[in-house]
């Protein structure tokens, strides 16, 4: 238990920040899940790219707010766009085989 006035305030502040950070983390993780779900459901190229851009923006915001480290943000974006690019290549391959 905190004894001093400043220690009590630190507890309040850290709890508030923990909840805010958790909200940012949940937000960008859900954006990533939306992209993955769109890929698994075979959504059109435009939809997947738009969702990927929104996920990228959410990750960048979390990095700028200090919720996650910039290297972790870069790694998450890289893995996300690797999946997106593989999906887009498979769509292009499917289009060429149909023609």
Swiss-Prot record:
Any one GO molecular function term: structural constituent of ribosome
Keyword Ribosomal protein: yes
GO annotation, cellular component aspect: cytosol; small ribosomal subunit
Alphabetical keyword list: Ribonucleoprotein, Ribosomal protein, RNA-binding, rRNA-binding
GO biological process: translation
Domain of life assignment: Bacteria
Family, as annotated: Belongs to the bacterial ribosomal protein bS20 family.
Function: Binds directly to 16S ribosomal RNA.
Xref: HAMAP family: Ribosomal_bS20
NCBIfam families (alphabetical): S20
PANTHER family per the UniProt record, alphabetical: 30S RIBOSOMAL PROTEIN S20, SMALL RIBOSOMAL SUBUNIT PROTEIN BS20C
Protein name, per record: Small ribosomal subunit protein bS20
Species per Swiss-Prot/TrEMBL record: Thermotoga neapolitana (strain ATCC 49049 / DSM 4359 / NBRC 107923 / NS-E)
């Amino acid at each position: 238990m905190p004894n001093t006035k400043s220690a009590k305030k630190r507890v309040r502040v850290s709890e508030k920040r923990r909840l805010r950070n958790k909200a940012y983390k949940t937000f960008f993780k859900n954006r990533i899940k939306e992209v993955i779900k769109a890929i698994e459901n075979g959504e059109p190229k435009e939809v997947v790219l738009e969702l990927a851009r929104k996920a990228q923006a959410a990750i960048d915001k979390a990095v700028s707010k200090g919720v996650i480290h910039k290297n972790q943000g870069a790694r998450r974006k890289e893995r996300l766009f690797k999946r997106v690019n593989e999906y887009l290549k498979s769509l292009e391959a499917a289009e060429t085989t149909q023609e």
